[in-house]
Amino acid sequence: HGKGFGVDALNADNHSWVLSRMAVEFDCQPGQYTDYTIATWINEYGRVLSTRNFTLTDAAGNEFGRAVTQWAMIDLRSRSALDLSWVGDAHADAIVDAPSPTDKPRKIRDVDPAQTAVHKVVYSDIDFNRHVNTMRYIEMMIDMLPLEMLMQEAPVRLDIHFLRECRYGQTLAVGYEQRGLTALFE
């Protein structure tokens, strides 16, 4: 993460990257101890968001997962998003002319939760930006799903939009609604 816009360089100016949206797909669940390779590239900068892509391939070269993530740069003091207009020109050499491996995160419709879990944010939930880590959100959602659904070997897609930060000491309510084969959370 060099080129002047990695986390270390940004933190020196009280800026950081935060995940705004993500879409992750897995064709299958990799077995324990599976060797895999992650490839990543940036293919787009907009005024507010940067798009970073990922693919996961097994040792035989078969792709079994992919992701499109969209990141905002924030001012750590005000916690507000910064204008990224300058990044595209200043760091044009970091942009790879390759398409995203899947669709960008889909719009999430209104959720009518049938079940809600309340969680007080503790130290182990937060990351270096001092807000809840993405994996903790995913764990909270997965923990609400029926075990039978989790044990299925069906392809999985996660679309997540982070609308606001949740920080240490705050209370987070995760709502869950099942619509057919689709699990929706808010």
Please give the residue ranges for each predicted region.
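Catalytic strand-loop segment that frames the active site of acyl-thioester-processing enzymes
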Residues: 1, 70-79, 84-151
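A short, polar/charged loop/turn motif at coil->beta-strand junctions and beta-hairpin connectors
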Residues: 13, 18, 111-113, 154
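Hydrophobic, proline/glycine-rich low-complexity stretches
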Residues: 1-35, 145
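HotDog/MaoC-like acyl-thioester-processing domains
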Residues: 23-109, 162, 166-169, 177-186
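Structured core of small recognition/catalytic domains
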Residues: 128-186
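A broad, structural micro-motif
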Residues: 17-19, 64, 132
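Short coil/loop residues immediately preceding or within conserved phosphate-binding loops
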Residues: 21, 51, 116, 123, ...
